[in-house]
Amino acid sequence: FNFCASMRTFVDYTLIAANRKGNAEHDDLKTMTSQIFDELPEYRFFEKLRNYIIHYSYPFGTLRKIAPDRVEFFCMKNHLLEYDAWGAIVKKDIELMPEEIDIRPYIRKVFPSLESIYLMMYYYYAEDYCNANSILANLQKKYNLEYPVIMSENNADNKNKIIRPFPVKKIVEGIEMLKYNPFLDISFV
């Protein structure tokens, strides 16, 4: 349940924030989330599974101990299909699933899309983040404060410190690509 509720809350609040930012941003993000819903069965399954849990039943029907300290939970397809509020598309998705549904692979398939939504929101606020940095720098100058820098250390002795500017332009270019392909798997290194 926590994953379903967190996913739904994240998407809802992201749309609320985009709406506050402006109509174009909200429309872009709404289009993106609609496209993900239309094209990714795992995403729509979890979006509707939250409603199932809140309004109908706990979804797990089988528990298997596979190691002394590890268990696996499975949803039973026939139990899920007893719920009548899945909607036609998600109901068909569930009908195509195995009788015992291990949701872990479904979760893994949803994460790249959630990251895309997050990065799109970051893109909308990137200029604000940069402006905040300038405002902070101006305050530090005004009050004669030492200007902070973000540094990385190569060793524990505080030697070889490296100042790395944040590559905002490259990040913005990458996020811009998400408008056209929200299913890119972006791995952070």
Regions found by a protein language model. Give the residues of each.
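Short, contiguous, well-structured surface segments enriched in hydrophobic/aromatic residues
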Residues: 1-29, 33
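Acidic, Ser/Thr/Gly/Pro-rich intrinsically disordered interaction regions
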Residues: 26-189
